[in-house]
């Protein structure tokens, strides 16, 4: 079995390198290349099926259990992933009208993320790949955010962004400005030196008693606010790092 491992080389850019099990990391096939992708880095269990670069299905199970705690509880998240991963994968394959035997490879989020949550997805993907005798491709989920611009459905009008381009990567746990020169060549130009934008918003929402998740709530209130109410000085620091 071929397992493609990801080595971070520049910024967050991974390159697929083969393990000693095989001297190539390329999927060779005369048939359409069909990949099952599994994501479990935080509190959403997701599975998608891609065929020759076209999205056939995308299924996500969210976890409402964290709302009572005002944030994601890692232990509860990993347990919920264990309950959700089988039905989510089954539904993704069913929606794509793809059998397990049709799969060319399985891709799974290796990190960054919550250790317990990642372990569920990686263990499931590894076991499934071994059982089917197909390659397992480990993926950096931040690169996945950036390359999401290239995902498209069948018959969808699609124009991929030209290289190089600048990407503002904002998620719950990461906020970065990334220069993308190629799908496997990326450079971090600047990033938050403390909390990510999502973390800052959720913390503010919790402190003010607005509930979780805080993003939709604060966004709604911000639209009703006065953007000139507070005057902030312009930052004058070296580099492009910033702080929330």
Name what the model sees in each region.
Residues 31-102, 108-112, 141:
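N-terminal beta-alpha supersecondary unit
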Residues 29-31, 139-165:
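Conserved phosphate-binding catalytic cores of ATP/NTP-utilizing and phosphoryl-transfer enzymes
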Residues 125-146, 194:
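Short, acidic/small-residue loops that bind anionic groups at enzyme active sites
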Residues 29-33, 41, 58, 161, ...:
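A short helix-loop
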Residues 108-132, 151:
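Short Gly/Thr/Asp-enriched flexible loops that form oxyanion-binding sites at enzyme active sites
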Residues 15-18:
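N-terminal polybasic/positive-inside topogenic patches
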Residues 37-38, 107-109, 140, 166-171, ...:
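Short beta-strand segments
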Residues 45-50, 167, 175-179:
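Short beta-strand scaffold segments in enzyme catalytic cores
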